[in-house]
Amino acid sequence: RLSLVGSEMCIRDRQVTASTTVINADGQDAARINVYYDKVKLSLDAVAFYDAKSNDVLDLSKFTIEDNTLVYTVTEPGEFSFWVAYKTHNTKDRPTTISAVEFSVPDAPEDPQPDNTSFVRRTLITQFTGLGCGYCPFMIAAMEDVRKSAEYADKSVLAACHTYGGDPYQPDVPLDYAMGVSTYPYVNFDFQTGIGNFGYNSNVSNIKKNIDKSLSVDAGAGISVGMEVAGNKLVARVTVKAARSGSFRVGAWVLEDGLTGTQLNNGMKGDYDFNTHNNVIRHVNSRYSGSDYSGHEVGALAAGGTGEHLFTMTLDESWVVKNCHVIFFVTELVDKGYAVTNAIDVPVKSSTIPFEYR
């Protein structure tokens, strides 16, 4: 089986590789960094390293160099973000970041069925809404009723994106722009299809049809997670296991439940609490480049092959951590773009989530 670990930041023929993107700030755990051009490893004497925040040149004499590899260790938590330049080429637009934390980086969960590639699949639903959107309750109610029904109870994960009219709970990136949202409410399924509001009954029918369409195709990959949470730091080692050969990316969104705000309602009736907002996107960690949030590169995998990505996220002090959870999703290259092929939703706490097989 093919196994990809560490991190690669590649722009055309320039490549920076790091053995890991998260280390324990114990002075021993290390990230080993190499620079390549046209697939040839470069001498570090020929490469300039720049601080990604200040764009100042870094003095490599302050780092450990072993066998033409920069070995990065640290005794204080923080981030080391840099880009490199070689002749007229550089990686400034896509810097590399090494995060140091005050606890051990989690291991990948053990695979309970190494020979199995048949995974439980869930649809990723992104619901675009806002407190000032009077017709949003017609979609919110429909979504709630579909997802709590016996038939659809465990077939999807939901992220609420509050991007309407300068909403106080808008996420930290413009997902509405990335997904081409021009009307509210709007619901996107797996970064592919979308629906607008046509009234409660039609919304229920359309949500079901799109979930059914998504799940009519088997999952292209499974997801396992080893997660550690200490204070306001979250580190997750996410493993992607391919069910079929393909190119994959992986992303993570932090959500929060129990947020309050008066919801404008243009007439949706029923026993719903429209003023309590759940599954609200707080942080997006899936930016590939520009306005593309399809996930971090895992790469090409053969069926049964695995790839990893390490996520490091800071939980804002204003969030109620016990009300937070994380969606991890995998996208797969289809036609000319990436579409979600599986997703899971897990609480924010130290935990081990193995692959879920059918």
Residue map of PLM features:
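Short, conserved sequence motifs used for protein processing/export or organelle targeting and
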Residues: 154-358
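Extracellular recognition modules
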Residues: 81-85, 327-329
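Short, solvent-exposed loop/turn segments at the edges of extracellular beta-sandwich modules
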Residues: 87-93, 334-335
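Short, solvent-exposed loop/linker segments at the N-terminal edge
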Residues: 12-15, 19-29, 227-231
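Short tyrosine-centred short linear motifs in exposed loops/low-complexity segments
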Residues: 26, 74-82, 246
